[in-house]
A protein has these predicted regions:
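Glycine-centered, small-residue-biased loops immediately flanking beta-strands
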Residues: 269, 292, 360
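Conserved class I S-adenosyl-L-methionine
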Residues: 268-277
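Conserved alpha-helix/loop element of class I SAM-dependent methyltransferases that forms part
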Residues: 252-267
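Conserved SAM-binding loop of SAM-dependent methyltransferases across substrates and taxa
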Residues: 278-290
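S-adenosylmethionine
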Residues: 299, 304, 319-394
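Class I SAM-dependent methyltransferase SAM-binding "motif I" and its flanking Rossmann-like core
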Residues: 34-35, 99-161, 326, 335, ...
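Class I S-adenosyl-L-methionine
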Residues: 1-123, 130, 152-153, 291-294, ...
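A contiguous loop/helix-start segment that scaffolds small-molecule binding in enzyme catalytic cores
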Residues: 2-28, 41-42, 92-94, 162-249, ...
Length: 417
C-alpha cells in the first residue's frame, strides 16, 4: 500500500513539473576560496540578480560589489532558520552561498531533504575534496571523503587506505593527528591544505605523530586534510579477538563472522547491539559498509568504557548506552538489532521488536540452554532462520593434535514484515 501511494505521489509530481513553477525556490550557489573570479557565468548571474543572500560570514565576504542583494548571516543554531527559509521572502527566490560543492557534506543536501528537489536548485563549484585530490595526485573515486564538521575526531581514524578529511576549524588537524598517534598510526602521511583553490593556498605535510607533537600555531580555519593511513595487520573482514580490549565477554571471531553474515549490513544502516560486552559486533558492523553506525547497550560500566575505547581504536561511530531495555528511550531508531546478551530478561525481545521498523531485521545468539529454549519458542511463533554452530580448535594432545570443542551457539534471525 505504501509503495502504491509513493508511486501515485511521484506521478502527480511529474505531471506538476510540466506546468510553470511560479513558487519561489532556494538557489544554492557553491563558491570556492577564489571567490567570484572562480564562478561560472550562470552562478554570477544568479548572485547578481538575487533579492536576498544567506551564508556564513566567510562565504559572504567572498562576494564582490557586483552583488547588491541584502546579505544575511546564518545564526547558530542554523537548522531552525533553514526550516523557515521560504517564509522570509515568499515573492522571490532565496539565494544561499555555500562552500564548494553544496551536495558533498554540505547545506545543499540538507535543504533538499527539508524542501524536496523541486524547490531547491544547486549550482555546484569544484569541491575542496576534489581540489585536495588534485593536489595529492589521487583519484577521487579511490579516495574516501570524511567530514569532521559535526562528527567526533575518532570517526576519521582508519586502519589503512587514504581519505580526504573535511575540517571543522583550525584545531581539527592537531586533534586528528593526536587521534592517529594515540591509536598506533603515528606514521600516517598527513597533509594539511589551507585556503585551497584561493590566492592564499598553502600545503604542509609530515607524519601524523610530528603534527601531534608540534602542531603549527598558524593553521587557517579553512583547511582540509589528506591522510594516507598507516596500515596494520588487522585489515580483514573479521578481526581477531586480540584486536579488541575485552574481559572475555566477547563474541569470538568465528561466530562473529557468521553473525555479521546474518546481520547483512547495508550502507548507512544503524545497528542496536544489545548486551554488547566488548562492542566487537558493533565495531565490525560499522567497518562493514560505508555510513554504518551502531548503538551499544551494556549494563556493566567497565565494559561500556571498553566499548568506547574499541570504537575509538577502530575509528567507528558507536554510541554507548546503559542497560537494555531501560535505555532504549531516546536512542535513534535501528534498522537492525543484534541481541548478544540478556535474552532471558523478561520482555527484552518484545521491546526490541517494538523499536524495529517494518522490514527491520533481528538476530539473536544464545549460549545457555535457557536462552536457546527461548529462541526456539520465538522461531515457532515467527519463523525466520534457526541455526546452531559448533566449531573446534586443533590443539596439541601429547605428541599429536586433537580437536577441542568450543561452546555451541544457537542463532535465530528474522525479518519483520
Amino acid at each position: 500500500m505504501n509503495e502504491v501511494k509513493r508511486r501515485t505521489e511521484t506521478d502527480a509530481g511529474d505531471e506538476r513539473s510540466e506546468e510553470p513553477n511560479e513558487s519561489p525556490v532556494i538557489v544554492v550557489v557553491g563558491i570556492g576560496a577564489d571567490g567570484m573570479a572562480g564562478l561560472g557565468e550562470s552562478s554570477r548571474i544568479e548572485l547578481r540578480s538575487a533579492t536576498v543572500i544567506y551564508g556564513s560570514p566567510r562565504q559572504l565576504d567572498l562576494l564582490d560589489d557586483s552583488v547588491t542583494a541584502p546579505q544575511r548571516r546564518w545564526p547558530s543554531p542554523m537548522l531552525p532558520t533553514l526550516e523557515h527559509l521560504l517564509d522570509d521572502d515568499p515573492t522571490g527566490d532565496i539565494h544561499v552561498v555555500a562552500s564548494g560543492d553544496p551536495l558533498l557534506h554540505g547545506i545543499g543536501a540538507t535543504l533538499i531533504r527539508l524542501y524536496g528537489p523541486d524547490q531547491v536548485r544547486v549550482l555546484p563549484h569544484v569541491s575542496s575534496a576534489t581540489l585536495a585530490c588534485a593536489r595529492m595526485g589521487w583519484a577521487v573515486h579511490d579516495t574516501e571523503v570524511v567530514s569532521l564538521v559535526n562528527a567526533p575526531v575518532h570517526t576519521a581514524v582508519r586502519r589503512g587506505g587514504r581519505a580526504v578529511v573535511l575540517s571543522r576549524d583550525a584545531a581539527t588537524p592537531a586533534a586528528l593527528a593526536a587521534a592517529l598517534t594515540g591509536t598506533g598510526r603515528g606514521a600516517s602521511e598527513f597533509t594539511v591544505l589551507e585556503q585551497i583553490g584561493g590566492p592564499a593556498e598553502r600545503i604542509r605535510s609530515g607524519p601524523a605523530d610530528i603534527w601531534a607533537a608540534a602542531p603549527p600555531a598558524d593553521i587557517d580555519d579553512l583547511n582540509i586534510i589528506a591522510v594516507r593511513y598507516q596500515p596494520d595487520e588487522h585489515d580483514g573482514l573479521s578481526l581477531p579477538d586480540a584486536a579488541f580490549s575485552h574481559d572475555g565477554q566477547i563474541t569470538k571471531q568465528t561466530i562473529r563472522a557468521v553473525t555479521l553474515a546474518a546481520l547483512s549490513p547495508r550502507p548507512g544502516e544503524l545497528l542496536w547491539d544489545v548486551g554488547s560486552g566488548s562492542g566487537s559486533i558493533a565495531v565490525e558492523w560499522c567497518r562493514s559498509a560505508p555510513g554504518c553506525r551502531a548503538v551499544a547497550f551494556e549494563t556493566d560500566p567497565q565494559r561500556r568504557e571498553r566499548i568506547a575505547a574499541n570504537a575509538i581504536a577502530f575509528g567507528v561511530d558507536v554510541q554507548v548506552r546503559g542497560e537494555a531495555p531501560d535505555d532504549f528511550a531516546g536512542a535513534p531508531q535501528p534498522d537492525v538489532i543484534f541481541i548478544g546478551g540478556g535474552l532471558t530478561r523478561t520482555g527484552l525481545v518484545e521491546e526490541c521488536f517494538g523499536h524495529l521498523p517494518g522490514g527491520g531485521r533481528l538476530v539473536a545468539n544464545a549460549v545457555t540452554a535457557e536462552s536457546e529454549a527461548l529462541l526456539v519458542q520465538w522461531h515457532s511463533r515467527l519463523a525466520g532462520e534457526l541455526r546452531r554452530f559448533q566449531h573446534y580448535r586443533g590443539e596439541p594432545l601429547g605428541g599429536f593434535t586433537g580437536w577441542r570443542p568450543q561452546m555451541p551457539i544457537t542463532q535465530w534471525s528474522v525479518k519483520l514484515l
